[in-house]
């Protein structure tokens, strides 16, 4: 009798196990189909805009906080601009430089000290460049360096100026070790009706060799084909 009970029990366990794997496999297929559907929808969206704020620093890279400059093809670029160009090239997106009326110091320490004062005063520097055809874009990358554990105040001005409701906003950052800090959460709070996705975070020292990691990230998001 015990053998019968044991056999029946084993059958029940095997049945439950088989049912579990069938259900798990079904759920996996559903998730994969949903992911594929989302990817196709993402790829089918309209044009991509790659907006960026950058400030090249001719005094080189500081080991602790990462000054933002790179020289390529005989030209001086801010790190963020260089990354923006990589994203634009990979996605076919239009480039847009966020520029301010005021100028910033170029030595790194003076720049960071100035950025700290600007942030503490909650200043909104005036912009000299403006997007006139925002409705043409569904996906907007927004790049910036991490200045004093936050995005530059010019980026606050940028998000104050535009309504990104219904659009996908992808922040990306260059930094000396602090990554995004809390800036992505700040952007999500400022643009409550936009879909905000955390984009690439590139350490200053890694910018020259960042192309492969950026392309891989774009592929994973379905923004470019593999």
Where are these regions (language model features)?
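Second-shell loop/turn segments in exported
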Residues: 69-77, 142-145, 170-176, 201-204
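Positively charged n-region of N-terminal signal peptides that target proteins for export
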Residues: 1-4
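Short, surface-exposed alpha-helical segments at coil->helix boundaries
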Residues: 77, 81, 85, 152, ...
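Glycine-rich phosphate/pyrophosphate-binding loop and the adjoining helix
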Residues: 195-226
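Sec-dependent N-terminal signal peptides
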Residues: 6-14
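Helix-loop-strand module that forms the ligand-binding subsite of alpha/beta enzymes
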Residues: 107-192
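N-terminal beta1-alpha1-beta2 submodule of the flavodoxin-like/Rossmannoid cofactor-binding fold
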Residues: 25-137, 219-226
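Hydrophobic alpha-helical membrane-insertion segments, chiefly the h-region
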Residues: 14-22
């Amino acid at each position: 009798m015990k053998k019968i009970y044991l056999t029946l029990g084993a059958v029940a366990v095997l049945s439950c196990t088989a049912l579990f794997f069938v259900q798990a496999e079904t759920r996996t297929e559903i998730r994969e189909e949903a992911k594929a559907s989302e990817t196709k929808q993402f790829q089918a969206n309209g044009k991509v805009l790659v907006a960026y704020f950058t400030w090249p620093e001719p005094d080189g890279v500081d080991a602790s906080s990462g000054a933002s400059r790179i020289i390529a093809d005989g030209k001086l670029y801010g790190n963020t601009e260089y990354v923006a160009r990589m994203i634009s090239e990979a996605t076919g997106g239009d480039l847009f430089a966020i520029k301010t009326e005021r100028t910033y110091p170029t030595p790194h320490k003076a720049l960071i000290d100035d950025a700290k004062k600007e942030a503490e005063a909650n200043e909104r520097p005036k912009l000299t460049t403006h997007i006139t055809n925002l409705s043409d874009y569904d996906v907007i990358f927004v790049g910036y360096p991490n200045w004093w554990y936050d995005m530059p105040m010019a980026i606050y001005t940028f998000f104050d100026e535009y309504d990104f409701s219904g659009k996908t906003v992808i922040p990306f950052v260059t930094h000396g070790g602090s990554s995004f800090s809390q800036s992505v959460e700040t952007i999500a709070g400022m643009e409550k009706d936009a879909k905000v996705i955390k984009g690439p975070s590139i350490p200053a020292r890694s910018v020259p060799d960042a192309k492969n990691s950026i392309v891989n990230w774009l592929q994973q998001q379905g923004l470019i084909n593999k």
